[in-house]
Amino acid sequence: MGSYRIRIKQSARKELEAVSTKADRRRIIERIQALATNPRPHGCSKLSGRELYRVRQGQYRILYSIKDQELLIHVIRIAHRKSAYR
């Protein structure tokens, strides 16, 4: 299995910029980068009714889709756990 490319939706980039602390932003970025080598890490969940996956990073949730044929991960949303699924 090769390394996946990561594409981050523009709205997800804005959500990342809005994360309150620099340390949280750094950890979220590291978590997203780790998805390139392991798109389904321990602790990730497939969301029911959608072709999306979720990983937790502290109080934040990263929602993304995986296109195995293209070796592509598309980050859809980065949000605080209280508002991630709305």
Residue ranges and their predicted role:
Residues 30-55, 83-85:
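A short, surface-exposed loop/turn module that caps and links secondary-structure elements
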Residues 1-29, 57, 65-86:
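Enriched for short, Lys/Arg-rich terminal
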